[in-house]
Regions:
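Structured, active/binding-site neighborhoods that engage oxygen-rich ligands
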Residues: 1-153
């Protein structure tokens, strides 16, 4: 993946940090406030969050991106799909939908990308897109790098 990082561009560290913080906070707030509605397909009766939540609950939309940050901290920028699979097995415990099937497949010895699709009726769900922001956050002005990370994911 090294060739996708060779492009240089001017980067204002303060502006970059502000944009990442804004993106992360927006995702955290949206995930927290949207959690009670997740998966519901009927008309919603919202109470406008009275009282407003004071904290968050476990949220796969955020938690999985923290696992990817851990992978980056321990493995560096040249992550492989196998690095991500090891992190998945070590740190992801969500048993439902595509996550549970992928974990079971990895434990059976199936490797990516087969581990994510084999016998996985949920493989077209939103897990991957919903956790993709992290790749954009770490690849400012480098859409090809972000795309490569997302592909590995």
């Amino acid at each position: 993946m090294a060739d996708v990082y060779e492009r240089s561009f001017p980067l204002n560290p303060a502006a970059y940090a502000d944009k990442v913080l804004g993106g992360w906070l927006g995702k955290a707030i949206g995930g927290t406030l949207g959690a009670p509605c997740e998966g519901k397909k009927s008309k919603l009766s919202l109470n406008f969050y009275d009282p407003v939540p004071e904290g968050s609950v476990p949220n796969d939309d955020l938690d999985l991106q923290l696992v990817w940050l851990h992978a980056l901290q321990t493995k560096g920028l040249n992550l492989t799909v196998n690095d991500l699979a090891k992190e998945w097995l070590a740190h992801i415990t969500y048993p439902f939908d595509e996550y549970g099937v992928a974990i079971a497949n990895l434990k059976k010895g199936l490797r990516p990308p087969i581990s994510g699709s084999y016998n996985n009726f949920f493989s077209e769900c939103m897990g991957s897109p919903i956790r993709s922001e992290i790749w954009g956050f770490i690849s400012p002005a480098q859409p090809l790098a972000a795309m490569e990370y997302a592909f590995q994911d």
